[in-house]
């Protein structure tokens, strides 16, 4: 009798699994200031860790279909952008049905959908190349998109700052220029994977004009987030005793402000995806 052959999954299945894994890894990462993690719900009374897991898992079909769409079109083009937009809206409906209407991963659908698609087009590309190509794809119009007066749009008008859309269109600078390099530096310095990922999150928080923070607590809250994240990194990161003290202080400040760096969390998931997908 021949030994059973291992089942070979498709590239689209693999990329969807990597993206969902990145979302779950981001949710599980602890202690994250102001965010849902294994300790608490952070500044989110309407969310929990099991809800974040369920939301991430609900996006697997949508992300797989995005990868398949990219393979079908075979290139970065406007029809692919339109297809991703439609699939993303369908994924958002599935997410909201799973969470009872709670917006857990809307920004992550956008970021990871783009990255899954460009990785499906060229799975051997490195992280920098994938981010640049995702930016090109994000710049294309989605003719079926209905303008929505979202929190992010209101923040953009009020404070003149870009959100998730602009980060993607620029090629994810907070991830490529800050999150991924910090992840690699912390690993090289001997930090555990958890601490390296926390440091990557902090590096993103330190530079991102996070619309989630601006919506909840305005520019002063954003300054608290950015300065607090820099303070942790200045003490050697989350792996050091001094860094952990700064991290606890930052968490308390954010809970007091009811501020949550949700945009940075979405970009950390993108960072973790690129960290793995960029080495396929």
Curated annotation (Swiss-Prot):
Q: Which reaction does it catalyse?
A: 3'-dephospho-CoA + ATP = 2'-(5''-triphospho-alpha-D-ribosyl)-3'-dephospho-CoA + adenine
Give EC number(s), comma-separated: 2.4.2.52
Q: Which GO terms describe its biological process?
A: prosthetic group biosynthetic process
Which Pfam family, giving just one, matches this sequence? CitG
Q: Does the keyword ATP-binding apply?
A: yes
Which UniProt keywords are listed? ATP-binding, Nucleotide-binding, Transferase
Under NCBIfam families, the record lists: malonate_mdcB, PRK01237.1
| PANTHER family associated with the record | 2-(5''-TRIPHOSPHORIBOSYL)-3'-DEPHOSPHOCOENZYME-A SYNTHASE, TRIPHOSPHORIBOSYL-DEPHOSPHO-COA SYNTHASE
Per the entry, what this protein does is: Involved in the formation of 2-(5''-phosphoribosyl)-3'-dephosphocoenzyme-A, the prosthetic group of the acyl-carrier protein of the malonate decarboxylase.
Q: What is this protein called?
A: Probable 2-(5''-triphosphoribosyl)-3'-dephosphocoenzyme-A synthase
Q: Tell me the name of the encoding gene.
A: mdcB
